[in-house]
Regions:
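ATP-dependent carboxylate-amine ligase
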Residues: 2-143
Length: 143
């Protein structure tokens, strides 16, 4: 248990990136069970959450599983939630049905730019994370 608590990053997951004053912590969720687990990891003290979903072949193009995820873990007074990604509109509908008002942005980088400076929790599915990491690495001079 002590070893697990000391893990800070695994293949980009849980990594923190400073993007123009926004400290974005990245979390990857690839299936309903992963999304449920990610919901428990959202820091309750953070006022901004970006959730991104793409629908490419590696993600699975059928996003009906969104309705199996309990998104209530991100819902709290004063928190801003931004849905994004290729299937951001589908995600926004799902969040609204869960009672979570959200804004909509085309891409995770756009969603992050729409946030106020400070901490931001960023939950993304596989290709949304992959594409976002490419942009982050470029911005940080890693690629």
């Amino acid at each position: 248990a002590a070893a697990v608590s000391s893990v800070t990053e695994v293949a980009g997951r849980y990594s923190v990136h400073d993007v123009n004053g926004r400290k974005a912590r990245l979390m990857l969720a690839k299936n309903p069970a992963g999304w449920q687990e990610a919901m428990t990891m959202v820091d309750p003290r953070v006022d901004q959450v970006v959730i991104g979903v793409n629908g490419q072949v590696p993600d699975g193009q059928d996003l009906s599983w969104l309705w199996d995820v309990d998104f209530s873990g991100v819902n709290r007074p004063g928190r801003r939630v931004i849905a994004c990604g290729e299937r951001g509109a589908d995600l926004a509908v799902r969040l609204e049905y869960a009672g979570i008002h959200c804004d909509l942005a085309p891409l995770p980088m756009d969603a992050l730019a729409a946030c106020e400076p400070g901490r931001v929790e960023v939950l993304l599915n596989y290709t949304a994370m992959r594409d976002f990491k490419v942009l982050l690495d470029r911005k940080e001079g890693k690629r």
